[in-house]
């Protein structure tokens, strides 16, 4: 499996956004079930939080959610990256960004608590209804844990 993961990861360096998007997404799906298989590439995934293509940024969030499902403890120092994505100019990225806070709020609420005020503010001010709802969901997940 390691060879296949390496081949998938090689597409992360592609100049073609669709290939980067798919590679990041695949690494997240693999990492959900076997973090050790993607661990060598994990920190490198964070560069996609600022990718020029919104779909790649969205895939980065999805990949992070997948990995965080079973390996949440590794995300503590990286929360500022996700906080920045809450302000992304792309609606779809902003709609998904609160979901990593929800996933981690259930598993490691101490990672999310410092961001509850920000999530609350966005839940009251963002122009996008889904963003507001997802921010509230992240707050509720954190409070319930």
Model-predicted segments: where are they?
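Alpha-helix N-cap/helix-start positions at coil->helix boundaries
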Residues: 2, 17-18, 54-55, 89-92, ...
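Alpha-solenoid HEAT/ARM repeat scaffold
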Residues: 21-24, 58-61, 95-98, 129-133
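Extended alpha-helical scaffolding segments
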Residues: 91, 98, 102-114, 122
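Alpha-helical adaptor scaffolds
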Residues: 46-73
């Amino acid at each position: 499996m390691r060879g296949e993961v390496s081949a998938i990861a090689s597409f992360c360096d592609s100049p073609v956004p669709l290939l980067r998007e798919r590679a990041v997404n695949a690494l997240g799906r693999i990492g959900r079930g076997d973090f050790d298989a993607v661990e060598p590439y994990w920190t490198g995934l964070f560069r996609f939080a600022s990718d020029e293509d919104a779909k790649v940024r969205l895939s980065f969030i999805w990949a992070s959610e997948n990995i965080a499902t079973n390996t949440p403890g590794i995300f503590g120092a990286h929360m500022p990256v996700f906080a920045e994505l809450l302000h992304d100019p792309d609606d779809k990225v902003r709609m998904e960004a609160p979901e990593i806070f929800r996933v981690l709020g259930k598993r490691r609420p101490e990672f999310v608590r410092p961001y509850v005020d920000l999530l609350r503010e966005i839940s009251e001010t963002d122009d996008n209804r889904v963003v507001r709802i997802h921010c509230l969901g992240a707050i509720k997940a954190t409070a319930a844990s």
